[in-house]
């Protein structure tokens, strides 16, 4: 029975990159149109006024203004209050 593995037969030795998810702009912070507000998997936060959602559920500002987090119909919602 071999006491060493053959060349390049190691099964470990790989790792995935961090996903960098989470809230990027917090309540009260100023945002410019296009700024990412939340990066998420699924809709933990839903888009509200002046907020768009990308295909990976990223929320982003559609207008310049300040970020406001709230709850509407038992859903966490993110709004941008236009400046």
Curated annotation (Swiss-Prot):
Keywords: Ribonucleoprotein, Ribosomal protein. Pfam families: Ribosomal_L27. One of its GO terms (cellular component) is cytosolic large ribosomal subunit. Gene3D superfamilies: 2.40.50.100. The keyword DNA repair does not apply. One of its GO terms (molecular function) is structural constituent of ribosome. It comes from the Bacteria. One of its GO terms (biological process) is translation. Coiled coil: none annotated. SUPFAM superfamilies: Ribosomal L27 protein-like. Belongs to the bacterial ribosomal protein bL27 family. This is Large ribosomal subunit protein bL27. The gene is rpmA.
């Amino acid at each position: 029975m071999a006491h060493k593995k053959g060349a390049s037969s190691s099964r470990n030795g790989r790792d995935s990159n961090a996903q960098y998810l989470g809230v990027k702009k917090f309540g009260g912070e100023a945002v410019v149109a296009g700024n990412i507000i939340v990066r998420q998997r699924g809709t933990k936060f839903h888009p509200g006024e002046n907020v768009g959602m990308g295909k990976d559920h990223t929320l982003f500002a559609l207008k310049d203004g300040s970020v406001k987090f709230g709850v509407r119909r038992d859903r966490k919602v993110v709004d941008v209050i236009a400046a």
